[in-house]
Amino acid sequence: MSVSIVMAEIPPGYYDGTDGLDGEELRLALHEIIDNHTVHSYSSLWTHFQSTDKKPNNKVWDMYSDIPNGTPPYEYTFVSDQCGNYGGESDCYNREHSWPKSWFNNASPMNTDLFHLVPTDGYVNGMRSNYPYGEVENTTWTSQNGSKRGTMNSYNFNGTVFEPIDEYKGDFARTYFYMSTRYTTEDSGWDENDMVNGADLKEWAVAMLLDWHQADPVSEKELNRNDAVYDIQGNRNPFIDYPVWSECIWDECESTGGNVPPIANAGPDQSVGENEIVYLDGTGSSDEENADLTFMWTAPEGILLNDPTNVSPSFSSPMVENSEEFIFINLLN
């Protein structure tokens, strides 16, 4: 039996044309890159979720019920647990527009864009309603995983909000940065409400989402989901690929030399035997501005890298029942 080691990378040249840009110029350049994605039907989302939101145990990855590194109060099986009707939490899962569809009048292509559509518990989805995300000060309702609804009084905003758990706040922040970029200049007729004006985020929302983005960095889950959605829609979430771009657009770039992202090289795909020592190879990575590179390799569950911050870490190939494929990602800063 063999183990296939596959290196996930951003398609070469995908972000050409972004060199040296920041602010609104960068946002518009990214808009042109991720615009005009392949649009799928609303009913097809049930099938696509099986590629984009599957846990390692093959259950539905529901961010409104999951407890990372813990035991979720309940889990859903794809297809058989689709809503339907529900009378309470843990009955079934449905399709959550994290950017509520009423904010864009349920128009296409936003209503089926997988970058903001995720499977969630139907009842919790209903309790979230179309309230903005925020940080609850006075709680009126709490889900079984700790997501909550209530009133917010911070970031110069006071009103009813829905707060996901800390472990997924960065995910939703990067989703909102994507939506604000993908649909800028295409938001005619969109809603203005407490959090957004069309596709533009209001000042308090930018401040909060940047804090969420920084406190909950990009995870392996997001990296894998970004690749899965790219395979389906043909576009990517730039703020997962290059997290610094959120600051470059809505705040300030940390680098004084521009915002040209480093080029990651993860080495070739490999096919190895069980229990072999395998070396990853990031030596071909480079930075146009000659900045020092910080490596962070992400490995699939069950594989322990000897040093994930090394340019070329190693690991022992796992024992497998059948030939299996494992995806590794080289994330550079």
Sequence positions of predicted segments:
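Surface-exposed, flexible coil segments in extracellular/virion-facing regions
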Residues: 295-316
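Surface-exposed, proline-enriched loop/turn segments that connect beta strands in immunoglobulin-like
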Residues: 265-269, 299-300
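Solvent-exposed loop segments of extracellular immunoglobulin-like
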Residues: 288-296
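Acidic, Ser/Thr
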Residues: 281-289
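Proline-centered linker/hinge motifs at extracellular inter-domain junctions
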Residues: 259-263, 313
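Short beta-strand segments of immunoglobulin-like
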Residues: 267-273, 284
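N-terminal module-boundary/linker segments of secreted carbohydrate-active enzymes
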Residues: 6-70, 249
